[in-house]
């Protein structure tokens, strides 16, 4: 990823402390029936989480204009949470990658915060973009 535009989406630079991306990582997104778009950037050799599992991740989230609204990389600390307690796009998307893997998600508003947004950082009806490294599955 770089600070360029693809399909009118601005991508911020890859966080400096992010792990490596597979050399054969896809350049194009795949889509699920729900409308979630994703690219598995590093497959990961471990277990895929289910909605009842707790995951530990590093992530960066940005809007379609490239503005980063949240980043565990920038805070220098990963985060753990039950996969059932996050937006639908995360719950669905994280099941597509194994422990140790990295995925890029493009989450439509109906799988994110919808019409309400999330405070000042995420406006209503925003498509959200995430780079997520799945560190552990518990």
Predicted feature descriptions by range:
Residues 1-138:
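Cross-family detector of peptidyl-prolyl cis-trans isomerase
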């Amino acid at each position: 990823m770089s600070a360029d535009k693809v399909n009118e989406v601005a991508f911020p630079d890859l966080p400096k402390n992010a792990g490596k991306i597979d050399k054969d990582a896809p350049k194009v997104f795949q889509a699920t029936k729900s409308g979630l778009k994703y690219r598995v950037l590093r497959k990961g050799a471990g277990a895929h989480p289910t909605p009842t599992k707790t995951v530990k991740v590093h992530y960066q989230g940005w809007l379609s204009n490239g503005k980063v609204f949240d980043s565990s990389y920038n805070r220098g600390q990963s985060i753990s949470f039950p996969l059932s307690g996050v937006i639908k796009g995360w719950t669905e998307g994280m099941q597509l990658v194994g422990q140790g893997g990295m995925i890029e998600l493009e989450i439509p508003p109906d799988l994110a915060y919808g019409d309400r947004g999330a405070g000042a950082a995420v406006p209503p009806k925003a498509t959200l973009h995430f780079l997520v490294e799945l560190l552990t599955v518990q």
